């Protein structure tokens, strides 16, 4: 995945979504990455836990999660979090950058293991 392709995936998911939920999705990635039923169950959880409150349709939540799954699969987590931190998108400031920095710090400190 090139940097440009990663940027398109981030735009698909939404920069704020990537920053806000990369950690949550990473925690569950290994258990559901190769199992379609578990992946859909996780997306259902994400939708009920967060998507409904954000007024996303189920399909919107699914699209956003799949975009983040592909970033993880292509081993671009650190680059994606850096992208979020460098973003000028004003919407990203509502917790997105703080969460991205916290996940990045945890990865760098070894507290957070990447699935690759």
Task: Name every feature range the model reports, one short phrase each.
Residues 48-63:
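Short, basic interhelical loop/turn and adjoining N-cap
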Residues 1-8:
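Basic, low-complexity segments
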Residues 93-116:
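Helix-turn-helix/homeodomain-like alpha-helical modules used for DNA recognition
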Residues 58, 69-70:
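An N-terminal, globular interaction/scaffold subdomain
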Residues 11-40:
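Short, amphipathic alpha-helical "recognition" segments used to contact nucleic acids or chromatin
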Residues 38, 42-49:
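Double-stranded DNA-binding cores of transcription factors and transposases
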Residues 73-88:
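Short Lys/Arg-enriched helix C-cap and helix-to-coil transition segments
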Residues 64, 68:
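Residues in the recognition helix of alpha-helical DNA-binding motifs
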């Amino acid at each position: 995945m090139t940097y440009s392709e990663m940027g398109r995936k981030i735009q698909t998911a939404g920069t704020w979504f990537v920053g806000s939920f990369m950690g949550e999705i990473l925690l569950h990635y290994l258990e559901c990455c190769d199992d379609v039923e578990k992946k859909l169950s996780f997306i259902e959880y994400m939708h009920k836990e967060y998507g409904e409150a954000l007024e996303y349709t189920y399909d919107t939540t699914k699209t956003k999660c799949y975009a983040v799954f592909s970033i993880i699969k292509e081993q671009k987590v650190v680059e994606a979090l850096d992208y979020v931190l460098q973003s000028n998108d004003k919407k990203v400031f509502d917790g997105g950058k703080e969460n991205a920095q916290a996940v990045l710090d945890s990865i760098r400190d070894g507290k957070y293991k990447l699935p690759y």
